[in-house]
A protein has these predicted regions:
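N-terminal signal peptide c-region/cleavage motif recognized by signal peptidases
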Residues: 13-15
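Electrostatic cytochrome c docking/interface patches
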Residues: 20-53, 148-149
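Gly/Gly-Pro-rich "capping" loops immediately C-terminal to redox-active cysteine motifs
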Residues: 36-40, 63-100, 106-120
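C-terminal capping alpha-helices of c-type cytochrome domains
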Residues: 112-149
Length: 149
């Protein structure tokens, strides 16, 4: 399994995807090295997006201890200490399009617009989150360290 993942990552190491409205997704290995917006990510705004049930919907599947958000999910992994395990570039790729790392993931692609299934006509060609929103989430998640939990 690890060999297959390694082969897939090697094949993806220079993949670039974009539409005219969105910043290019430049994937190197298991990370997206180029930010998706010129906006510098704000951890405070990222926390709000993470907890909002009308924005990123992150708390429907994930949980962070100490976060003021009731009924946090348990479908996805708990994200406490994620900043110790992944770099900001690795976090960015997992938010933007986790299916590039695991084609069986149930996590939605928040930035990819092509090759999706059953997308309502009103939302076709639109990202679920803007590049700036993703950068805010990256800033928030990257600062979640084990000693902070």
């Amino acid at each position: 399994m690890r060999w297959a993942l390694g082969a897939m990552l090697f094949c993806l190491c220079t993949q670039v995807m974009a539409t005219s409205e969105q910043q290019a997704m430049r994937v190197v290995g298991d990370a997206m090295v180029v930010p998706l917006s010129e906006v510098t990510g704000s951890a405070e705004e990222g926390e709000q997006i993470f907890a909002a049930r009308d924005a990123g919907h992150c708390v429907l599947c994930h949980q962070v201890s100490g976060l003021d958000a009731p009924f946090q999910g348990n479908i996805g992994p708990a994200l406490g200490g994620i900043g110790d395990r992944l770099s900001p570039a690795q976090i960015r790729l997992r938010i933007a399009d986790a299916s590039l790392l695991n084609d069986q993931t149930i996590m939605p692609s928040y930035y990819r617009t092509e090759g999706l299934h059953r997308v309502d006509e009103r939302y076709r060609g639109r990202t679920a989150l803007s590049g700036a929103q993703i950068e805010h989430l990256v800033a928030y998640l990257a600062q979640l360290r084990s000693q902070n939990q």
